[in-house]
Amino acid sequence: EPTLCGLPFFQRVLALQKQYAGGKQIHNAFQTNGILLNDDWCRFFRENGWLVGVSLDGPADLHDTYRVNRSGKPTHHKVMKTIDMLVQHQVEFNLMVVVNRHNSQHPQRLYRYLQDLGTPFLQFIPLVERDECGNLSAESVTEQAWGSFLNGVFDIWVREDIGRVYVQLF
């Protein structure tokens, strides 16, 4: 999680980029779970034109299946607060969904939820982890479930959102 480095670290990164860019334009992107973002971070992103990727695995019941804090408490409400802040500060952002065994069973519901949030940029990546024996972990999405998930999302996207919502894989 890059926010653990603190905002001063990224302010320094930006200063070094300006110092050494030699007139070249640099585009910065920042992927985060969103938990530690605040108004200062949002102002920094807006003022410096950074694209922010926020990890959101669906509505609360889908997201909070695996996205909990160190105490095991759900994080969906904090991510939604972050999204509201990004919108308020007019920061360009996209949503990245880690597709796992649980949320892969709900492609239409998940996509509709993301549609309602209004961001035109979406990414889906499969969770594929292996246990010590080389077998897929219990949380991982199988290849069949991943394919079905993408088909379900694509069916809605191609009918309703083509040219309006950009899904990285389509």
Where are the predicted features?
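Canonical radical SAM enzyme core domain
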Residues: 2-52, 56-62, 69-81, 85, ...
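Radical SAM enzyme [4Fe-4S]-AdoMet core and its adjacent flexible, acidic
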Residues: 65-77, 84, 88-170
